[in-house]
Amino acid sequence: MKHLYGLFHYNPMMLGLESLPDPTDTWEIIETIGKGTYGKVYKVTNKRDGSLAAVKILDPVSDMDEEIEAEYNILQFLPNHPNVVKFYGMFYKADHCVGGQLWLVLELCNGGSVTELVKGLLRCGQRLDEAMISYILYGALLGLQHLHNNRIIHRDVKGNNILLTTEGGVKLVDFGVSAQLTSTRLRRNTSVGTPFWMAPEVIACEQQYDSSYDARCDVWSLGITAIELGDGDPPLFDMHPVKTLFKIPRNPPPTLLHPEKWCEEFNHFISQCLIKDFERRPSVTHLLDHPFIKGVHGKVLFLQKQLAKVLQDQKHQNPVAKTRHERMHTRRPYHVEDAEKYCLEDDLVNLEVLDEDTIIHQLQKRYADLLIYTYVGDILIALNPFQNLSIYSPQFSRLYHGVKRASNPPHIFASADAAYQCMVTLSKDQCIVISGESGSGKTESAHLIVQHLTFLGKANNQTLREKILQVNSLVEAFGNSCTAINDNSSRFGKYLEMMFTPTGVVMGARISEYLLEKSRVIKQAAREKNFHIFYYIYAGLHHQKKLSDFRLPEEKPPRYIADETGRVMHDITSKESYRRQFEAIQHCFRIIGFTDKEVHSVYRILAGILNIGNIEFAAISSQHQTDKSEVPNAEALQNAASVLCISPEELQEALTSHCVVTRGETIIRANTVDRAADVRDAMSKALYGRLFSWIVNRINTLLQPDENICSAGGGMNVGILDIFGFENFQRNSFEQLCINIANEQIQYYFNQHVFALEQMEYQNEGIDAVPVEYEDNRPLLDMFLQKPLGLLALLDEESRFPQATDQTLVDKFEDNLRCKYFWRPKGVELCFGIQHYAGKVLYDASGVLEKNRDTLPADVVVVLRTSENKLLQQLFSIPLTKTGNLAQTRARITVASSSLPPHFSAGKAKVDTLEVIRHPEETTNMKRQTVASYFRYSLMDLLSKMVVGQPHFVRCIKPNDDREALQFSRERVLAQLRSTGILETVSIRRQGYSHRILFEEFVKRYYYLAFTAHQTPLASKESCVAILEKSRLDHWVLGKTKVFLKYYHVEQLNLLLREVIGRVVVLQAYTKGWLGARRYKRVREKREKGAIAIQSAWRGYDARRKFKKISNRRNESAAHNQAGDTSNQSSGPHSPVAAGTRGSAEVQDCSEPGDHKVLRGSVHRRSHSQAESNNGRTQTSSNSPAVTEKNGHSQAQSSPKGCDIFAGHANKHSVSGTDLLSSRICHPAPDQQGLSLWGAPQKPGSENGLAQKHRTPRRRCQQPKMLSSPEDTMYYNQLNGTLEYQGSKRKPRKLGQIKVLDGEDEYYKSLSPVDCIPEENNSAHPSFFSSSSKGDSFAQH
C-alpha cells in the first residue's frame, strides 16, 4: 500500500514497534490533559530529570498506522522551531492482553488550545482583543512558514491544533495528515482535513481528479481559524460536516459575524486568507507583511506576557468542554450518517402531520441545507439547486450500490440503484420516468442516472462505458437550445434504453427520439436561441480558421442564428465556452465511433443549412405574370449549393418553381416570394430533422449489442425518459401544445400506476383501504387524442382543406370541443385556452395549420438526392417511419459488444451498407402525414416501451423562476406539488400498498427465504405467510390472489434474497471448484495413461523397425562372409599364399539411427588376384602377419538398448614363432547414399560381385544369433554346441577357418560362466583395446 503523504511509503512494519524503547523506564503519567483525534493525551514526568511533557497514547490500529507513521516521520524530520511543538521521541509499551500502545512524547503546552481560550472568554462575556489575535496568528504564521520552508503542508490548521504554553508561547501541533512534498512546486490532490477548515481546492479534489492544491491551503484554514478566534466558532459550525463540503465551494468567502465590530485590518487579513482562487491567494510569507500582522513587531514580549496573564486568569474559571471536530479522509471509506440526526425527514411519508404547510416547510428547510432530494415512499422529489454540487463523485456511487434505501440520504443514485437491483433480482425491464416543468433539472437528472447505471453495470469494455456516457452530450448538442426559462432546454423527447446481460453487465444502449422542434431552426422567439450545435460549430470553425471552407461569413451572422441584439458574432468569437463545447462534441463523435468522413459530412450539412437561410427572394414583375420570384443574392445560393454538393441552378429552380402533374402532363409553375421562402425554410427544417434522426440511428448502430448476446441471454433494459417539460410562455404556439399534451400523457401514466391501478386492485382483492382522491386527467387526454372529434383529429382534418385558415381552425375547435378544459378568450381572434393539469395555457393559433402540414416539395427532394455528399443522398433516400423519423439502417460496423467475451460475439452476420429495415407498418407516405399524426404515433410508441417495464418516478421541481441558487418560492413550489399530485402521492404511499404480487410469483421469487432448495412449496397463502413471517415483516396484507406490500417491503425482501443467493453462490463456487479439480485430476491421469500407452507403442514399433534393419544388414553381411569362406575353401592349399596377405582382417561397422552399431569382422585368406578383384573394398594390413594357429572372427551384436561389441582376437602363435597381431580396419556399412567412411562412393553390387566371382557350391549358412540382452549367455552355449555338432559331421578345417571365441574378450569375460582361457605368452593387449591410432579411432567411434 502506498503511503498517502508522498515522501514516505507506508509499510506497517516500518516503524519497528518491537525495537522502540519502553516508555515506563523513562516517563510516568501524572494526569489526563484531553482527548486527541486517535487517542488520549496525558501529562507525564521524566523519571530521570523531573521534566514535564505531554504524551499522546495511541493504539496501533491498522487503519491509523499510516497517519501515526506520517506524524512520526515529520516530527523526526522537522528541525526545532519556537512555534512548532518539540518532539521527544516515540515509545512502545507492549501488552499481550489488550495490545500494545504507541507513545508520542511531545512538548507540554499547559495553556491548552486557542479554541478553549476563546470559548472560555466568550462564556465570561469577553473576547480576545485584536492585538492578542494578531500575536497568535503571527506565531501560527511563523510555524507554518517553517513547515512550508521544509516542504511540509499541515492540512489541518485549526484552533484546536494551535496550543499555548503557560508563558504565552504559540505552538503548532498534530501532523497526522500533513503532507511532505518532494519539491516546492509539487501539488497534492488528496482531499483531507477537518471539513469546516478545508479549503475549496482541497474539497474539489474529491470531485475533480485533475484538481490539485499547494501549501496555500493552509492559508485558507488559517483564515477560518482567524474567524474562530473572533467569533468562537468556524463558519457553518452548526451544520453537519458532510453538508459543509457542499457549501464551502459554492458559498462566497465567509466573514466575521459582525465585521463592523472589528478593525479594518483584521477584516482585510481574513479576506486575503479566504480568496477562493488559491492561485491569487497570498502565501504565508506575504501574509507576514500584512499590516495586521506587522503590528505585532516590537510588541512580541509584551503581548506574550499579556497572553500568559490571560491564560492564568482562565485557569481560575470553570473548565470549558472541548469541542472535537473529527477529520475526514476521502481515501478512507466512510458512510454518511443518518440524516435524521442532523436534518429533517428524508421521507415525507414519515411525517406525523400531512398537509401542504408541513410538506412545504420540510422541502424549504432541506433546500436551504442543500438537501435537494426527498423521498415520497419510493418516489423521488428533486429540487433544482441551480448550482453544481459535489455529491456525484465515484465515492457517492459506491455509497449507493446495493444498500438499503434508508441507509443513506435521498439521492438520484438511489433511484438508479433501485431500478438496477429490481432488474437483476426480478429479471424484469425497468423504466425511470423523469418529469417536471421546463428548467426543473430533468436533463441533468437523466445524465446522473446514466452515469450511475454505467457504474453499476461494470462494463467489461471501458470503451462502451465511455460511449454511453458521451451519448447524452452529443444528442443534447443537436436537440437542446436556450429558451427564455432554461438555458439548456430539451426540444425533443428522448427515451434512452440501457441494455444489460442477465447478470447485470451493461452491453449496449438505444435512443428513441420524438417530436424534434424543427421549426426552431428557421425562427426563434425573443430571448431564445437556435439549437446549440450551430453556435458550437461556428465558434469551432472560426477558431480553426475554417469558416471559408464551409462558405460561412466571418462578420455578419447567418440569418438563422442572428438575434435582435446583434452580438451573436461577438459572443461566438469571444466566448471560450462555445469553442470548448465544439471540442467536446468532436470528442463525443470520436469516442462513440463516428468516422472523420461522417463528421465532416455532418458539418457540411449544418453549414449548408446556415447558408440556405441566407438565400433571399425578390419578385419579378413582367407583362403577363407578377408572382414570379428570383434569387437576388446569387452568392448565398452558390455557397449553399457548394457546401451541399449540388448544382446551384437546380437548387434555384427547386426553390423558385414547382412541378404540378395534371392528367399525365407536367406543368412547371413559378413560386411567389412567400412560397419560395416557405420552400427554403421547409428544406432547412427537413435537412436538420433528418440529420438529427440519422445521428440518433447511427448512435444506435454503434451502441447496439451483438444479436447473439441478446438471443442467447435474453438481456434486460432500464429505460430513462427525458422529455420536454411543461411550458407556458408569453406566446405559446403549436410546439408548446404538443409538448404539453405529451406531459399530460406522462401525468396520466403516473396517475394510473400510483393511484388508479392500486385502488382498483383493492376493490378486486377485497382489501379494506381508504380511497385517495386525485385529479384524473383522462377526460383532458380524450379531448386531445380521441377520434374523430379530438383536437388533433380536427387539426388534421382542417389541414387537408386547401382553403382552410387559422381562423377557421379556431372556429372548428370552438364548435366541437365543448368541455370545461377548452375555452375561447374574448377579444382575441386567433387564440384558444386549455386547462392543463399544471395550469391554464393560452395558445396562439397563428401558423398552426402550416406547421402541421410541414410540406416538403418533391422538387427539393429530387435535387438533394443528386448531391455528391453520400450522407445527404442517404438522408433523402431512406423512408420515414410513422413517428416521422428515418427508418433504422444497418452498416458494416463493429457493434458495441464486440469486446465482450468471445462466446457472446460469435457468428456476426455482415449486411450491406445502408440496408434499410423495412416494416410495412412503419413506412408511410410523407405527403399524407402531418406533424399531429407523427406526434400521435410517437406517443403510442413511447407508451408501448414504458408499459413493458416496472416504473420508477423522479419528480423534478423548479424552486424559482429566476434560476437563482438557494432561492425558494413557496408559491411556485406549491403549485407544482399540486399539479403533479405529490400531496396525494404522500397520502397513498403512507396508507396504500404500492406492490401487489400474485401468490405464485411471490412464492417463486422468495421461497428461498423460508424453504430449502429441494422443497417445492405450493403457491398458497400459507406459503406466502411463512415467507413473510420468516422475513420478519409487518404491515402486509393478503388479498384473494395477491400479496399487498408497502414500498419498503420489497426492498427488504430483495436485500434478504440477495444475501441468501450470495451465500448459495459461495457454496456453489466452492463445490464447483472441488468438482472441477477432481474432474481435472481424472482427466490428467487418463491423459497420462494414454500418453504412456502411445509412448510404449511407439518405442515398440521403433525398436522392431530398427531391429529389422539390423537383422537385414547382418543377414547380408553373413551371406557375404559365407561367400568369402566358400571361395577360400574352394582354393584350398593349392593356392599360393603371399606372406604379406596370409591373414587379413576385415572389420565392418554398420551405423544405424539411434547410435546402434554393429561390428562385423572376418579373417580369411585371399589370393592376390582376389584382393585386386575386390577393387579396394577389402584392405589388408601393411604388416600382415603369417598364418596364425587360430584366427578369430570378431562379431558384434546390437540390442535395443544400445550397441554391444563382441569381438575376438587370435592367439599369438604365428608360423614363424613370432607374436604378431593381425591388424583390424573399420569400414562403415553402406548407407542410402552409398558413401564409405571416407566419403568415397561405393560401387553398387560390389559385394554381390565377390559372390558371383567365386561361384562354388554353397554350404549351409548358419544364421548368426542375436543377443537379446547382455545377460543372455545362451548364445555362447548354443554356438559351442553348433561348432561341436559341425565338427562331428565335417572334416576339420584349417586353423584359419575355424570360428572360435577368444577367451580373452572383455565382453565374453562378463558373460561366460566358466573361467577365462589362460593366456599364453600374452604380452600384448588385443588390438581392439590397443592404444594405436586406429584402435583409438574405433573406440571413439
UniProtKB/Swiss-Prot annotation:
Active-site residues per Swiss-Prot or TrEMBL entry: D156 (proton acceptor)
Family named by the database record: In the C-terminal section; belongs to the TRAFAC class myosin-kinesin ATPase superfamily. Myosin family. In the N-terminal section; belongs to the protein kinase superfamily. STE Ser/Thr protein kinase family.
Keyword field contains Cell division: no
UniProt entry tagged with the keyword Kinase: yes
Subcellular location: Cytoplasm, Cytoskeleton; Cell projection, Stereocilium
Name of this protein: Myosin-IIIb
Biological processes, Gene Ontology terms: cochlea morphogenesis; positive regulation of filopodium assembly; regulation of actin filament length; sensory perception of sound; visual perception
GO cellular component: cytoplasm; filopodium tip; myosin complex; photoreceptor inner segment; stereocilium tip
Residues given in the record as ATP binding sites: I33, G34, K35, G36, T37, Y38, G39, K40, V41, K56
Species per Swiss-Prot/TrEMBL record: Homo sapiens
Highest taxon, organism lineage: Eukaryota
Assembly and oligomerization: Interacts (via C-terminus) with ESPN. Interacts (via C-terminus) with ESPNL.
Enzyme Commission numbers on file: 2.7.11.1
Biased composition (Polar residues): 1118-1133, 1170-1186
InterPro entries recorded: IQ_motif_EF-hand-BS, Kinase-like_dom_sf, Kinesin_motor_dom_sf, Myosin-III_kinase_activity, Myosin_head_motor_dom-like, MYSc_Myo3, P-loop_NTPase, Prot_kinase_dom
Gene3D superfamilies in UniProt: 1.10.10.820, 1.20.5.190, 1.20.58.530, 6.20.240.20, Kinesin motor domain (3.40.850.10), Myosin VI head, motor domain, U50 subdomain (1.20.120.720), Transferase(Phosphotransferase) domain 1 (1.10.510.10)
Residue numbers spanned by region Disordered: 1111-1205, 1232-1266, 1318-1341
MF terms in GO: actin binding; ATP binding; microfilament motor activity; protein serine kinase activity; protein serine/threonine kinase activity
Catalysed transformations (reactions): L-seryl-[protein] + ATP = O-phospho-L-seryl-[protein] + ADP + H(+); L-threonyl-[protein] + ATP = O-phospho-L-threonyl-[protein] + ADP + H(+)
Domain Protein kinase: 27-293
